């Protein structure tokens, strides 16, 4: 099985905030989804099918790392974030992991 999307714009315009936003997970497709069905080098391409040069992907990864903010969690904490305003992820963790999540509108 193979998933093909796109082409998708890396940047969208958020009408609520009246500004351009990075709305894309291309870096994570390149660095994080390698398995028997996914070749990271071919995971992100230009519209003509040519792969994005690795140095550009890694430049984007470095920018994401420089701009990242870590929240030090404490028992009882709750974090609400706007998926349009912030790209979110998590760092690696040591087991056991317990997932408590809720989606709200």
Where are these regions (language model features)?
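Active-site environment of non-heme Fe oxygenases that use a 2-His-1-carboxylate facial triad
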Residues: 1-78, 84-105
